[in-house]
Amino acid sequence: MLFRSTADQGEKVMKNLVFNNNGARALGECALVPDPSPISQSGITFFNTLFDENASNHLAIGAAYATSVEGGADMTEEELKAAGLNRSDVHVDFMIGSNQMNIDGIHHDGSRVPIFRNGDWVI
């Protein structure tokens, strides 16, 4: 749950988005996209989320995609909520990836499993 937000630019817009839209304070998506993806390697920022989100790891606040759970496309809003999907009128992606990003999975016993190294899949 997002409780505070700051920004070097556009902070007022960000706060309005987060605190004035139901469900916008919760995570809606977490996507791992390898840096060597074709969109990333093009070096172009398209200023179109549907393209740009395929260039980088990203997190989204707001609505989760119904299709991220089996049968989700046929579920009611109540069923989606019961399945744990965040519901909101907004879904905003924030790109966070780079060719220097390392990501580990952590087991219950604390041991780590490398997932991403230098912006690319290990497993």
Regions found by a protein language model. Give the residues of each.
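Short, glycine-/Ser/Thr-/acidic-enriched flexible segments
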Residues: 7-10, 35-38, 64-66, 108-111, ...
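A short, polar/charged loop-to-alpha-helix boundary motif
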Residues: 11-21
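A short, structural micro-pattern
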Residues: 24-26, 51-53, 97-99, 109
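C-terminal hydrophobic structural anchor segments
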Residues: 26-92
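Extended hydrophobic packing segments that form well-structured cores
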Residues: 78-123
